[in-house]
Amino acid sequence: MRILLSNDDGYFAPGLAALAEALAPLAEVTVVAPERDRSGASNSLTLDRPLMLRQAPSGFYYVNGTPTDCVHLAVTGMLDHLPDMVISGINHGANMGDDTIYSGTVAAATEGYLLGIPSIAVSLANHNALYFDTAARVVSDLVRRLQNNPPTEPTLLNVNVPDRAWDAVRGISVTRLGKRHKAESVVKTSNPRGQTVYWVGAAGAAQDAGEGTDFHAVANGYVSITPLQMDLTRFSQMESVTAWLKP
């Protein structure tokens, strides 16, 4: 099996190294990740300048672009084979509910999915994450399962792991995405030169976090696995919008 790894925290991130080490006994692993932290880059592609691919002493490749750039470049321009799987992570912090829209971690996996490759995004639900070994073990188990029972169609899984020791994880739960309250307002401040600058506000707290959601599973010590899709069509409004457009 051949696996392409990426992330949005950068090629130097501990979560990426932990995942690469855990998967090495299971597959031929190639790492292509951003040269710096690109958290929140979502599915953006770099179109205004060329991309450069370099190799670090660790053997990991890094790109002066976004997580989506990394996977797109690797699959369509670097590798001489199509990976059997694309895995993105381990992210430092959760990607649940609305986070998935903004997440570079999820975006890297999404690009693999759009290129027809089974893909997994994995996040450790704590920005000061400690138990990367737990998340790596979860992903290794998923890879073995997918090896033994390959999906019949391209699959995109969003995995969130509680930041705790393996023995303290209560199990795995297949979930739907929850929802957050709206984000906090931007923070207005000044830089050392007295110029007004703004920082994007914090993400909103969980709003829809009931049983069956990713928020609920992780809060209760379970690994959350949410199958994702790309069709954003709101089918329930098609008739009402059609009626609204009639003269």
Swiss-Prot record:
Record-listed a divalent metal cation binding positions: D8, D9, S39, N91
Keyword Transport found: no
Role description: Nucleotidase that shows phosphatase activity on nucleoside 5'-monophosphates.
Protein origin, superkingdom: Bacteria
Pfam entry (one): SurE
Cofactor: a divalent metal cation
Any one Gene Ontology molecular-function term assigned to this protein's record: metal ion binding
UniProt GO cellular component terms: cytoplasm
InterPro entries for this protein: SurE, SurE-like_Pase/nucleotidase, SurE-like_sf
UniProt EC number: 3.1.3.5
Compartment annotation: Cytoplasm
The gene coding this protein: surE
UniProt-listed PANTHER family: 5'-NUCLEOTIDASE SURE, 5'_3'-NUCLEOTIDASE SURE
Record text on cofactor binding: Binds 1 divalent metal cation per subunit.
The organism of origin for this protein: Thiobacillus denitrificans (strain ATCC 25259 / T1)
Name of the protein: 5'-nucleotidase SurE
HAMAP family documented for this protein: SurE
Catalytic activity: a ribonucleoside 5'-phosphate + H2O = a ribonucleoside + phosphate
Annotated keywords: Cytoplasm, Hydrolase, Metal-binding, Nucleotide-binding
Stated family: Belongs to the SurE nucleotidase family.
